[in-house]
Every structure is written in C-alpha cells, then in structure tokens.
Regions:
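Conserved beta-strand positions in repeat-built beta-propeller and related beta-rich domains
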Residues: 1-4, 42, 50-54, 102-105, ...
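Oxyanion-binding "anion nests"
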Residues: 51-61, 69-103
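Aromatic- and glycine-enriched pocket-lining scaffold segments that form the walls
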Residues: 1-13, 21, 25
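Beta-rich, blade/repeat-based domains predominating
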Residues: 30-47, 77-97, 130-145, 174
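Short loop/turn segments immediately following beta-strands, especially the blade-tip
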Residues: 12-20, 61-69, 113-120, 159-167
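Structural signal for beta-propeller blades
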Residues: 7-9, 56-58, 108-110, 155-156
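C-terminal hydrophobic structural anchor segments
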Residues: 111-160
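Beta-propeller fold detector
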Residues: 21-28, 69-77, 122-130, 168-174
C-alpha cells in the first residue's frame, strides 16, 4: 500500500484468519519527499512500479521469488528540462507488459515508457498533451485504447495506442 506522506510502501501478509499483518520482510522506503501514490505490477516479470506524486518520479522494484524486493531504477516522468510544478497522478501498463503510461496533473501530460522484455528496464519514449489536470486514466483490455479524464476538464479523451510503438494519437474528445 503506497503511503504518500510517509514515503513508504507498506507490505502485508494475509493470514488464514483473513487479517492483515505486517510483512516479515518489512516495508519499502522511497526517497524523502517522493510521495508514493499508486502502484502497478508487470503481468509477467515480477516488477512493481510506483508513481510518486510529489516529486514526479517513477520507481521500478523487482520482487524475487522469496519475497525480497529490490529497487532497480527511478526515472523522471516529465520531459528533460521541465521546471514546473510536479503532481503525479496515475499509472497503468498495457496488458502485454510492453508499455507503461503515467499521468501528471501540473503539466497535463501523459508519459510513455517502454519496458525491456528481458531486463525489465524502463526507457522514456514520449510525452503527450491531454486533458487539463489528468487525474485518472484507463487502458482497455485489448491494450489499443487509453481513456483519460481531466480534473479541470469537462471532457473525456480517447487516445489510440499504436501496438508496435505505444505512441498515442487522439481519436476523440467528448
């Protein structure tokens, strides 16, 4: 569970009594002031991604079979040289695990990252303008469409996802 104000991702186990208990391997700590907000899990490789709301970063962690989790990388969600406010919002992967998207409210951008299928490493690929203050978005089950709403918008935007590249193209806004 991502705990924004504590800069920690809490881990739990579920007992036979249906009660949660702290995980014996402990919690995951993020950078001070990062503000972990949302988590996503890769469908195949055991990687866990954390969107940090307050510093606009994206962390990748790897979960080993024994339950140990190690930090692998931390990337900026915004374009190189971006100097404005940071306010990360949401994170989703395509169902095939090849692409990861984040939304950032202050810049009104969706960011695209490629996921290396061998190592799991993230590569920043592109940034796309979208609805003002994009608080939430979803990717359809086929992985061909991304639907986004803006906190400061009356519209919903539908972006098509190019299967080979993950690039977004605006299909409609209503």
């Amino acid at each position: 569970v991502a705990c924004l104000k504590e800069d920690v991702i809490r881990r739990f186990t579920l007992g036979d009594d249906d009660l949660l208990a702290p995980h014996p391997l402990g919690d995951i700590h993020t950078a001070p002031g990062a503000g972990p907000r949302h988590l996503a899990r890769h469908p195949d490789n055991g990687d866990i991604y954390c969107l940090n709301e307050l510093d606009g970063t994206l962390n990748r962690y790897h979960r080993e079979a024994d339950g140990h989790i190690s930090a692998r990388e931390s990337l900026d969600m915004l374009p190189e040289g971006y100097q404005g406010e940071r306010w990360g919002a949401d994170i989703h992967l395509t169902p095939d695990g090849r692409f990861l998207y984040t939304s950032e409210r202050a810049s009104s951008l969706l960011s695209l990252f490629g996921i290396d299928q061998e190592s799991g490493a993230l590569t920043p690929l592109a940034h796309f303008p979208t609805e003002p203050c994009p608080r939430g978005f979803a990717i359809d089950h086929s992985g061909h469409a991304l639907i986004v709403t803006g906190q400061d918008s009356q519209d919903v935007a539908l972006h098509r996802i190019a299967p080979a590249t993950g690039q977004l193209s605006l299909a409609s806004r209503q």
